[in-house]
């Protein structure tokens, strides 16, 4: 059996920076859950501030500090999803500093890359002969607002392409999980928009085994369709 813990949106700014400076670990009570999981997956929405300025097209912007990113080790994060609407907030230098920290601390990331096509690559987990793949996408309705001439490459959600990815992987792994930053038309809403259930069911029909959604910053309902779970939004983990 493979145990994967999915947590919601992560933004280690403001109060988390203060707590880190005070030497406080606000996640200690979750340690027994997160450190007993084989893998922990979260949507990382805060980039480290860089030297190139900020994405003036985007409001609000999220940011953190390198020191505060150390909290990711306190939650045993295995994989950071970067396909989200805050990935451009601190331009290329902020992206580089953030992903360099992840690499140095052996935290994998998917959904975005700098100047190359690695943003398209899924993440693979395997334990006891069970193979799991996770694919990460962001929908345009979440308003990422990419700056002009930016070299950050992001895995945007296009249903036809996602279905192609599912079918390409279907016979190579045991479980396909879609990790979706979506539902921008109802950000802050308690329910998915009218299109999301239709899309989610089509993706299950195409061969996905589980859909994990985020972006709304609220916990939204889930459904079981043909025996497969669709979680429309996990809400915030720390924000």
What does each model-found stretch correspond to?
Residues 1-239:
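Acidic, metal/ion-coordinating pockets
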């Amino acid at each position: 059996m493979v145990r994967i813990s999915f947590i919601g949106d992560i933004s280690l700014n403001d109060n988390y920076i203060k707590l880190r400076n005070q030497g406080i670990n606000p996640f200690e009570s979750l340690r027994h859950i997160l450190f007993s999981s084989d893998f922990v997956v979260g949507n990382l929405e805060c980039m480290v501030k860089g030297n190139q300025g900020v994405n003036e097209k985007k409001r609000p912007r999220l940011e953190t500090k390198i020191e505060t990113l150390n909290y990711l080790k306190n939650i045993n994060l295995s994989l950071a999803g970067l396909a989200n609407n805050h990935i451009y907030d601190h331009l290329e230098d902020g992206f580089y500093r953030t992903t360099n920290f992840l690499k140095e601390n052996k935290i994998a990331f998917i959904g975005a890359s700098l100047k190359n096509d690695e943003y398209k690559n899924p993440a693979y987990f395997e334990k006891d002969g069970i193979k799991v793949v996770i694919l990460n996408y962001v929908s345009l309705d979440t308003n990422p607002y990419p700056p002009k001439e930016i070299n950050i490459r992001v895995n945007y959600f296009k249903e036809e392409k996602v279905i192609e990815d599912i079918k390409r992987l279907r016979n190579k792994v045991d479980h396909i999980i879609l990790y979706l930053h979506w539902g921008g038309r109802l950000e802050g809403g308690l329910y998915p928009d009218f299109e999301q259930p239709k899309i989610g069911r089509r993706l299950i029909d195409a061969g996905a085994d589980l859909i994990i959604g985020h972006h709304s910053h609220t916990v939204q309902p889930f459904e079981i369709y043909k025996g497969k779970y669709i979680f429309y939004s996990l809400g915030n983990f720390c924000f």
